[in-house]
Amino acid sequence: MMEALLVATGGFFGAITRFAISNWFKKRTKTSFPIATFLINITGAFLLGYIIGNGVTTGWQLLLGTGFMGAFTTFSTFKLESIQLFNRKNLSILFLYLSATYIIGILFAFLGMQLGGI
């Protein structure tokens, strides 16, 4: 039961944080590139790598890794925005978004793990 509470608590704060950051960017940027989702997912990849690399206890992994990072990052929004770019025939931005998210995401996860100690 405690494990579920840790995941739920982290998830609550992760979702609220993502919501706030997304809204902040929407009010300040006018671009076809989905910058908020990109930065959230890249930051999440780095932080999750750092959490895992740091070797924190299972409780912290559940709270921060599974809970917070699971709700903070957003695979579904990433895919939805990719489809929207495709439907709008904005293929150059789509290619940039897909390649940057995957390449930089993997690099940042690796960097986080290295800085965390793995």
UniProtKB/Swiss-Prot annotation:
It is a multi-pass membrane protein. The chain crosses the membrane at residues 1-21, 33-53, 55-75, 93-113. Disulfide bonds: none annotated. Signal peptide: none annotated. One of its GO terms (biological process) is cellular detoxification of fluoride. Na(+) binds at G70, T73. It is found in: Cell membrane. It catalyses: fluoride(in) = fluoride(out). InterPro entries: FluC (IPR003691). One of its GO terms (molecular function) is metal ion binding. The keyword Ion transport applies. Keywords: Cell membrane, Ion channel, Ion transport, Membrane, Metal-binding, Sodium, Transmembrane, Transmembrane helix, Transport. GO terms for cellular component: plasma membrane. Na(+) is not transported, but it plays an essential structural role and its presence is essential for fluoride channel function. Belongs to the fluoride channel Fluc/FEX (TC 1.A.43) family. Fluoride-specific ion channel. Important for reducing fluoride concentration in the cell, thus reducing its toxicity. This is Fluoride-specific ion channel FluC 2. The lineage of its organism: Bacteria, Bacillati, Bacillota, Bacilli, Bacillales. The gene is fluC2.
